[in-house]
Amino acid sequence: MNWKEAEEKASRYLRHKGFKILARNYRTRFGEIDIIARYRGYLVFVEVKSGNSFFLPRTRVDLQKIRHIQLAANDYIMNTKDSFKGYRIDVIEVTEKGIEHFEDIQI
């Protein structure tokens, strides 16, 4: 499965769970955020990783990647007129076995 298919599956999964998708592939000078969503008044910045289940794709989300997502998220926040309670960073792993959603990733 390619990255585009993985992001589409992740978007469908989030919508099914009640998330409202605000943007996909949001690009900044700091990097790209795969999915930006709203859930229960919070902004959720989602990194999507795909691959096989033998090598867990989520392990490719390291400290540097999270920092880049935080910088890109701050860029989005500075440029949005939406109000929100707060934000978090999630990781969604898409493999042939299914989808795993890791919420509120911390560094």
Swiss-Prot record:
It holds the Pfam family UPF0102. GO terms for molecular function: nucleic acid binding. InterPro entries: Restrct_endonuc-II-like, tRNA_endonuc-like_dom_sf, UPF0102_YraN-like. Belongs to the UPF0102 family. This is UPF0102 protein Tlet_0667.
